[in-house]
Curated annotation (Swiss-Prot):
It comes from Canis lupus familiaris (Dog). The gene is BRD2. A motif (Nuclear localization signal) lies at residues 556-560. Residues 1-28, 53-73, 268-349, 456-653, 739-803 are annotated as: Disordered. Residues 481-515 have a biased composition (Acidic residues). Chromatin reader protein that specifically recognizes and binds histone H4 acetylated at 'Lys-5' and 'Lys-12' (H4K5ac and H4K12ac, respectively), thereby controlling gene expression and remodeling chromatin structures. Recruits transcription factors and coactivators to target gene sites, and activates RNA polymerase II machinery for transcriptional elongation. Residues 634-716 form the NET domain. This is Bromodomain-containing protein 2. Keywords: Acetylation, Bromodomain, Chromatin regulator, Chromosome, Nucleus, Phosphoprotein, Repeat, Transcription, Transcription regulation.
Length: 803
């Protein structure tokens, strides 16, 4: 039907009908005369319709150039940072959408925009300039950013939303630029093989695409103009002779260019940008060849400059994902080889620390971690007093370098450096500063991950070593006699064992191979066996432990009954169970020194003189060894299940508060491991209610806290509880305890008041029965709450004590 319409037709109605697909007869008067008459006005004067369109088109000047063959560009470390870090952060921001493309004054109805703003700029243009290596220096790119923000502030009112959005983006821009490399260095870009051939093909392709995209810029809005380009567009696209080079998304985008060109676009440069993005994603997952096709940034770029720029872009993409490569290129080859050969295996805990470091440096936390990526440049930031206040600067890049060079021997050193970095920030900046809030946020991330630190495989080593010992040795060590020489020598042996275990932990963290670890384990096992043999030799003679245990359990069940039977029965009970008493303090010391690792085999420790419900929390108050710690429980089961008194819980709470920061993670781990209800709770917000914790959990915490606090000042903590108590005070305390005990006995057995006194005199008459007195005083410690005393019983007690 189109053949009926000629360009020189003088019958607009007939031409109109022809365009609608109607025959010439439809143009005659009839029922359908109204349809053609409606469109008649549009075709009455084609030139009149095209004039306003031609007047509107120049309202949007051509967008800024994104490539210039006459102006050389290059790739520098600063430009790469602006492209990969700054632009990426700004482009993804929720306020970035108005700045991603040039201002379309026609579409937005801003006729005076280009009269006021003489140099338009947008992030899309800057991004494409960076991709095309348009800039020679980073300052040119930063100037474009500043121009974009300034244009926004000049044209809009200060209260407009767009101004607030621009201010937010500018703040982020300045923050990112603050951590940009200080010295600008040109990066060497390697040119891949065959890039020139493909660059030439790209030039031909780009030329054809350019011609296709230039059509709508010249075309009119008139209907006749809309129908003239379509026959040319498919021929332009189909003339591309290299389908092997072009990826399928590009072909699809080119074929879809036809219908897109029919519509008048308000911003023509946006279309090539969208196509280029699609192919670039394809290129990222395949080979550098399609990337070379994508390199040119705009339709207006001449073919001559496309070869070099297409060849230079792919290496930049590869390097952008490896921020640690550029510094390494400055190192000599020998140094690089030395670094790689020097590295050994990381321990499990250091591997966990390395994972924490990677997370802190990840994009996930970049919004608040970026100030800590690199050392503080005091001169560049104008912080002239920084190094006067901060004596030991620290940053994440330094921590990473030390981790790569294996400078950290254990996780504590790593944590100390990270915490030093945060403390420097808190020390130098005011509390309400933005960087302090960022530091707190990042430290929360660090502490949360660090609290999940796994146990070192060899850290609980003493436990299997101890359980592998012959039963006789372990039993004899827990059942030795009460001689002073044996207790002194055993305490020395415990200190030696503590040192050995500390050395073992250090060695295990720095060990390089499984063979060395096994060898050290064997050596330490032999040393432990030798120590136990010495302890066995020092003891008077071991008694069989199974029988001992049964006796102790029976005594525990009959404790209350024996209490009612009188003092004599208690003395007999004490004589029967006094043999293992002196070695228990020693073993508790060892168990607490090793962090609770060997407590299960070597005897559980007792802590605190004030007892809860048990009667086996003795305080060693003999004149021969006053500084000895209260210790000792009859068996492991009793120790684990013995509830804590209020005073002990209070002391434990105070001790936990004294722990350094790096030790608190282990406290949380102990609680979560032993309390199923808290296993899934957040370590950052965990609340420790001592009333709800199991006794075994509290005892384990007590052992760990004591081991942590005792390792630093070894002896001050062992005499912590008796601090300030002289021998006289201890004697008075013992008198009060005996007095209370005698009151209980006299209240129940009035007729047998004298025998306890004689028994106590007998007990004090020999050195072997001194233990019974301490045993008795310890067993009476549970009745500290009663404070009444009588003068007669006090005199009896003083006689027995002086005896």
């Amino acid at each position: 039907m189109l053949q009926n319409v000629t360009p020189h037709s003088k019958l607009p109605g007939e031409g109109n009908a022809g365009l609608l697909g109607l025959g010439p007869e439809a143009a005659a008067p009839g029922k359908r005369i109204r349809k053609p008459s409606l469109l008649y006005e549009g075709f009455e004067s084609p030139t009149m319709a095209s004039v306003p369109a031609l007047q509107l088109t120049p309202a949007n000047p051509p967008p800024p150039e994104v490539s210039n063959p006459k102006k050389p560009g290059r790739v520098t470390n600063q430009l790469q940072y602006l492209h990969k870090v700054v632009m990426k952060a700004l482009w993804k921001h929720q306020f970035a959408w108005p700045f991603r493309q040039p201002v379309d004054a026609v579409k937005l109805g801003l006729p005076d925009y280009h009269k006021i703003i003489k140099q338009p700029m947008d992030m899309g243009t800057i991004k494409r300039r960076l991709e095309n290596n348009y800039y020679w220096a980073a300052s040119e790119c930063m100037q474009d950013f500043n121009t974009m923000f300034t244009n926004c502030y000049i044209y809009n009112k200060p209260t407009d939303d767009i101004v607030l959005m621009a201010q937010t983006l500018e703040k982020i821009f300045l923050q990112k630029v603050a951590s940009m490399p200080q010295e600008e260095q040109e990066l060497v870009v390697t040119i891949p093989k065959n890039s020139h051939k493909k660059g030439a093909k790209l030039a031909a392709l780009q030329g054809s695409i350019t011609s296709a995209h230039q059509v709508p810029a010249v075309s009119s809005v008139s209907h006749t103009a809309l129908y003239t380009p379509p026959p040319e567009i498919p021929t332009t696209v189909l003339n591309i002779p290299h389908p092997s080079v072009i990826s399928s998304p590009l072909l699809k985008s080119l074929h879809s260019a036809g219908p897109q060109l029919l519509a008048v676009s308000a911003a023509p440069p946006a279309q090539p940008l969208a196509k280029k993005k699609g192919v670039k994603r394809k290129a990222d997952t395949t080979t550098p060849t399609p990337t070379a096709i994508l390199a040119p940034g705009s339709p207006a770029s001449p073919p001559g400059s496309l070869e070099a720029k297409a060849a230079r872009l792919p290496p930049m993409r590869r390097e952008s994902g490896r921020p640690i490569k550029p510094p390494r290129k400055d190192l000599p080859d020998s140094q690089q080889q030395h670094q790689s050969s020097k590295k050994g295996k990381l321990s499990e805990q250091l591997k966990h620390c390395n994972g924490i470091l990677k997370e802190l440096l990840s994009k996930k936390h970049a919004a608040y971690a970026w100030p800590f990526y690199k050392p503080v440049d005091a001169s560049a930031l104008g912080l002239h007093d920084y190094h006067d206040i901060i004596k030991h600067p620290m940053d994440l890049s330094t921590v990473k370098r030390k981790m790569e060079n294996r400078d950290y021997r254990d996780a504590q050193e790593f944590a100390a450096d990270v915490r030093l970095m945060f403390s420097n920030c808190y020390k130098y900046n005011p509390p309400d500063h933005d960087v302090v809030a960022m530091a707190r946020k990042l430290q929360d991330v660090f502490e949360f991950r660090y609290a999940k630190m796994p146990d070192e495989p060899l850290e609980p080593g003493p436990l299997p070593v101890s359980t592998a010992l012959p039963p006789g040795l372990a039993k004899s060590s827990s059942e030795s006699s009460s001689e002073e020489s044996s207790s002194e020598s055993s305490s020395e042996e415990d200190e030696e064992e503590d040192e050995e275990e500390e050395e073992e932990e250090e060695e295990s963290e720095s060990s390089d191979s499984e063979e060395e670890r096994a060898h050290r384990l064997a050596e330490l096992q032999e040393q432990l066996r030798a120590v136990h043999e010495q302890l066995a030799a020092l003891s008077q003679g071991p008694i069989s432990k199974p029988k001992r245990k049964r006796e102790k359990k029976e005594k525990k069940k009959k404790r209350k009954a024996e209490k009612h039977r009188g003092r004599a029965g208690v003395d007999e009970d004490d004589k029967g169970s006094r043999a293992p008493r002196p070695s228990q303090p020693k073993k508790s010391k060892k168990a607490s020194g090793s962090g609770g690792g060997s407590a299960a085999t070597l005897g559980p420790p007792g802590f605190g003189p004030s007892g809860g419900s048990g009667t086996k929390l003795p305080k060693k108050a003999t004149k021969t060894a006053p500084p000895a710690l209260p210790t000792g429980y009859d068996s492991e089961e009793e120790e684990e299940s013995r509830p804590m008194s209020y005073d002990e819980k209070r002391q434990l709470s105070l001790d936990i508060n004294k722990l350094p920061g790096e030790k608190l993670g282990r406290v949380v781990h102990i609680i979560q491991a032993r309390e199923p209800s808290l296993r899934d709770s957040n370590p950052e917000e965990i609340e420790i209610d001592f009333e709800t914790l199991k006794p075994s959990t509290l005892r384990e915490l007590e052992r760990y806290v004591l081991s942590c606090l005792r390792k630093k000042p070894r002896k001050p903590y062992t005499i912590k509880k008796p601090v300030g108590k002289t021998k006289e005070e201890l004697a008075l305390e013992k008198k009060r305890e005996l007095e209370k005990r005698l009151q209980d006995v006299s209240g129940q057995l009035n007729s047998t008041k004298k025998p306890p006194k004689k028994a106590s005199e007998k007990t004090e008459s020999s050195s072997t029965q001194q233990v019974a007195v301490s045993r008795l005083s310890a067993s009476s410690s549970s009745s500290d709450s009663s404070s009444s005393s009588s003068s007669s019983s006090s005199s009896d007690t003083s006689d027995s004590d002086s005896g």
